[in-house]
Curated annotation (Swiss-Prot):
NCBIfam families reported in the protein's UniProt record: uL30_euk
Gene responsible for this protein: RPL7A
Protein name: Large ribosomal subunit protein uL30
InterPro entries: Ribo_uL30_ferredoxin-like_sf (IPR036919), Ribosomal_uL30 (IPR039699), Ribosomal_uL30_euk (IPR005998), Ribosomal_uL30_euk_arc (IPR035808), Ribosomal_uL30_ferredoxin-like (IPR016082), Ribosomal_uL30_N_euk (IPR012988)
Transmembrane residue ranges: none
Annotated organism of origin: Candida albicans (strain SC5314 / ATCC MYA-2876) (Yeast)
Keywords attached to this entry: Cytoplasm, Ribonucleoprotein, Ribosomal protein
């Protein structure tokens, strides 16, 4: 029985298709290996961060015990980070505090942002103090905010941080590949804090459970809600998150 030869053009086409399929399979294999390696890097970093946080916490506890044992006082390190949330309205705001609220991207009620605490930012926040509540967020508060209400600015769009790939695509050039990298950069106020802060969309919080205090617009130390509440910001954020 005679063998039917395929036309040369068909043979060439089949060879090209086979070559393309082989190249795709090879590329897929490389991608799979790269993704596996990346997952390992992300996992190892998260474990290292947890170890770092735990050791820092133990160090503070030990320092406090040592201070107590020697009959002296433990002085907390100067805070480097604040979380600022706008709690007062739109109307009749003088130009200076209005400008500060715009600079902080607090253009809506219950919007919140992380701010690196410096002399300059402290003075800015002071100008806006009658309209905001702020304080020193804990690691737990930062993590809860980012995981529950974290959105990034991608091509001027508000995109949920539902995948590490979104973070890597926008912050990978700063070696920030995952949501835990992002949280670590905020909590430690790392070298790329500004880039991370600018990438994060202002957090949209809710009115606190049970509402604000009756004297909401007085300073916190006077029984109101505005101004610096130091560590007590964590309780407010928990109510609003």
């Amino acid at each position: 029985m005679a063998t039917t030869l395929k036309p040369e053009t068909l043979q060439k086409k089949e060879k090209a298709q086979q070559k393309t399929a082989e190249e795709r399979a090879a590329a897929k294999k490389v991608r799979k290996a790269a993704n596996k390696e990346k997952r390992k890097v992300i996992f190892d970093r998260a474990a290292a961060y947890q170890k770092e946080y735990t050791e820092a916490e133990r160090s503070v506890i030990k320092a406090k015990r040592d201070a107590k044992a020697s009959n002296s006082y433990y002085v907390d390190a100067q805070p480097k980070l604040v979380f600022v949330v706008r709690i007062k309205g739109i109307n009749k705001i003088p130009p200076k505090p209005r400008k500060v609220l715009q600079l902080l991207r607090l253009t809506q009620i219950n919007a919140g942002v992380f701010v690196r605490l410096t002399k300059a930012t402290s003075e800015l926040i002071k100008l806006a103090e009658p309209y905001v509540a702020y304080g020193y967020p804990s690691l737990s508060t930062i993590r809860q905010l980012v995981y529950k209400r974290g959105f990034g600015k991608v091509n001027k769009q508000r995109i949920a941080l539902s995948d590490n790939a979104i973070i890597e695509a926008n912050l990978g050039k700063f070696n920030i590949l995952s949501i835990e990298d992002l949280i670590h950069e905020i909590y430690t106020v790392g070298p790329n804090f500004k880039q991370v802060s600018n990438f994060l969309w202002p957090f949209k919080l809710s009115n606190p459970n049970g509402g604000f205090r009756a004297r909401k617009f007085q300073h916190f130390i006077q029984g109101g809600d505005t101004g610096n509440r130091e560590q007590f910001i964590n309780a407010l954020v928990k109510q609003m998150n």
